[in-house]
Amino acid sequence: MLRIHLLQIAYNMSDPQMGDFLHENSTARKFAGLALADRTPDESTILQFRHLLEKHDLGKQVLELVNDGITSAGLVLSKGRIVDASFIEAPSSTKNRDHKRDPEMSSGKKGNTWHVGMKMHVATDDIIGIVTSAVYGPANEHDISRARELIPSETEQVYGDAGYVGMGKREEFQTDKEAEKRSYRINLRPGVLKGRSAEDLIRKIEHFKSSVRCKVEHVFARVKLQMSYRKTRYRGIAKNAHRINTLKVV
């Protein structure tokens, strides 16, 4: 059933679509370990299994298990982290059983644009861009408010955009014993660079920070563009968080 769930996530299918897909596609059946004579799980069975995974937050556990395997294989060699956050929009329609919008979703602003939904906070390593941790909250949370949850104590350097300016001075980081050894390579606000030439040393330093930090944007591109998860699928942050964590594993 777990393989069926991963297939459903990878191909962005509803429960009925997944049931039909297993009937029609022999390769999918083989991947799921189903012989031709085996009974194919119907949509209610697929739904119940997904609810079981959500109840025990197994999406997060699977992500941690995969990361442990990557670390033990020596693929994450750096103690640097890149942090960033991105909005996941929530449907504005009230055409549902309660005739209300999801109470866990909220509105947040980026630049001059308002977003209604939730926010995905992510940390990756600074060499390959592998997701090392992720937390989720309402859209009105500031990016920096969840940064401490993303960064392990042994982290030596942290990259982030201008939304994380002053991160190292926050109380939750000051109580960290390793904070004194850590460097925070945070991009300056755009206005600071105004009027500086392309050859200016400060601008070159900022360009280097951005060239490292762009790796975390690939995570958002995969989730929101390749996997088409621009909008929430379910009501509540926890259910959507489970699906996004599973997407990162896939």
Language model features with spans:
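Short helix-capping/linker segments at secondary-structure and domain boundaries
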Residues: 10-17, 130, 227-232
